[in-house]
């Protein structure tokens, strides 16, 4: 009996000691891979799938050598997609034509996830939530793009089109787009970055009508936007 009591006491002491130890701090060493305008990857639109994969592998290898442990991968630069399981169109920056996917077919986000995880790195999906177009040249925007399907959801500012997040249906739509990725891909995080509301220009931002319709208790439009 005394041996059993001693064993239980020792086990309790060890367990308490383990739980009392604080978990070691983990340094987050993340790096962005921008796909918009082919800034980081792919180097240009229209590359074959094999060349796209080779380029991405080289980028990931470099970040692994530099001791990065997280990749923040831009998956939605302009209300379009760098992943297959999307109701939005393929990004212009893949093939040089919005709505046209990689040839031969593969899923860039799925490939990026697999390759990052092989290297012990997290893969975070980076969304540009409100920017819908990058260029004033409308010929680059597919007629099937959301800006043409739902024009009432957008305002034009500084030669670009933006979702109007003051509209409840816009917020619901963006939430749906992001949750689809969360549910269908083994990502390790979600990032909102770059182009929420546009940077201030000389012209007034044309969302005052939306503010009047949906003030949500705010009297100052700047506070309303921040909220």
Show the residue positions of the predicted features.
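Surface-exposed amphipathic alpha-helices with a cationic face
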Residues: 64, 110-124
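Aromatic-lined carbohydrate-binding/catalytic grooves of carbohydrate-active enzymes
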Residues: 66-103
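Bacterial Sec-dependent N-terminal signal peptides
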Residues: 1-22
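Aromatic- and acidic-residue-enriched segments that line the glycan-binding/catalytic groove
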Residues: 81-96, 131-158, 194-221
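Active-site-adjacent "subsite" loops/lids of carbohydrate-active enzymes
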Residues: 26, 34, 38-54, 114, ...
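Second-shell loop/turn segments in exported
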Residues: 42-49, 59, 98-102, 160-165, ...
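Catalytic domains of carbohydrate-active enzymes, especially glycoside hydrolases
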Residues: 54-80, 184-187
């Amino acid at each position: 009996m005394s041996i059993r009591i001693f064993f239980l006491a020792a086990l309790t002491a060890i367990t308490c000691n383990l739980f009392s130890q604080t978990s070691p701090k983990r340094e987050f060493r993340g790096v962005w891979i921008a796909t918009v305008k082919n800034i980081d990857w792919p180097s240009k639109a229209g590359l074959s799938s094999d060349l796209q994969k080779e380029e991405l592998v080289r980028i990931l290898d470099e970040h692994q050598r530099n001791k990065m442990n997280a990749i923040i991968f831009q998956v939605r630069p302009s209300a379009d997609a760098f992943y297959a399981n999307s109701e939005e169109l393929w990004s212009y920056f893949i093939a040089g034509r919005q709505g046209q996917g990689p040839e031969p077919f593969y899923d860039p986000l799925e490939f990026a996830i697999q390759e990052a995880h092989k290297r012990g790195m997290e893969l975070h999906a980076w969304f540009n939530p409100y920017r819908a177009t990058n260029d004033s040249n409308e010929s680059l925007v597919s007629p099937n793009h959301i800006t043409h399907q739902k024009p009432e959801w957008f305002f034009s500012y500084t030669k670009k089109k933006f979702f109007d997040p003051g509209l409840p249906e816009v917020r619901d739509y963006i939430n749906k787009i992001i949750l689809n990725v969360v549910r269908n891909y083994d990502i390790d995080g979600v990032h909102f970055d770059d182009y929420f509301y546009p940077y201030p220009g000389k012209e007034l931002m044309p969302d005052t009508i939306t503010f009047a319709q949906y003030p949500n208790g705010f009297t100052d439009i700047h506070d309303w936007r921040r909220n």
